[in-house]
């Protein structure tokens, strides 16, 4: 049985989030949560929340052993980019891209 959680329009860079997501994929839920809890960057906190949501979704299914769940897949897609401008010297301006991410976590029952 699989469980899924999706977080859209998260204000974290998709590139940096994928670096953290690669470390979590294939781990047991408890081990993945401990890893994310003590990883000192913003994407880890966002992924931790999505993982908790997927775990809560799994517990609602019924007949599922939540402790035996494994992180089957973590998909990080790029969301829309917010464009901002920063004033610079001599009347110029520089474009700043604030990137967003769509994060999907899929849990499955099974062995690590």
Curated annotation (Swiss-Prot):
Q: Which organism is it from?
A: Desulfovibrio desulfuricans (strain ATCC 27774 / DSM 6949 / MB)
Please describe what this protein does: This protein binds specifically to 23S rRNA; its binding is stimulated by other ribosomal proteins, e.g. L4, L17, and L20. It is important during the early stages of 50S assembly. It makes multiple contacts with different domains of the 23S rRNA in the assembled 50S subunit and ribosome. The globular domain of the protein is located near the polypeptide exit tunnel on the outside of the subunit, while an extended beta-hairpin is found that lines the wall of the exit tunnel in the center of the 70S ribosome.
| Complex formation | Part of the 50S ribosomal subunit.
Q: Which CDD domains match?
A: Ribosomal_L22
Designated gene of the protein: rplV
Against InterPro entries, the record matches this protein to: Ribosomal_uL22 (IPR001063), Ribosomal_uL22_bac/chlpt-type (IPR005727), Ribosomal_uL22_bac/org-type (IPR047867), Ribosomal_uL22_CS (IPR018260), Ribosomal_uL22_sf (IPR036394)
Specify the superkingdom. Bacteria
- Family (UniProt): Belongs to the universal ribosomal protein uL22 family.
Q: What is this protein called?
A: Large ribosomal subunit protein uL22
Q: Which GO terms describe its cellular component?
A: cytosolic large ribosomal subunit
Tell me which Gene Ontology terms the entry assigns under biological process.
translation
Q: Where are the transmembrane segments?
A: none
Keywords noted in UniProt: Ribonucleoprotein, Ribosomal protein, RNA-binding, rRNA-binding
Work out whether the entry's keyword set contains Ribonucleoprotein.
yes
Record PROSITE patterns? RIBOSOMAL_L22 (PS00464)
Q: One MF term in GO for this entry?
A: structural constituent of ribosome
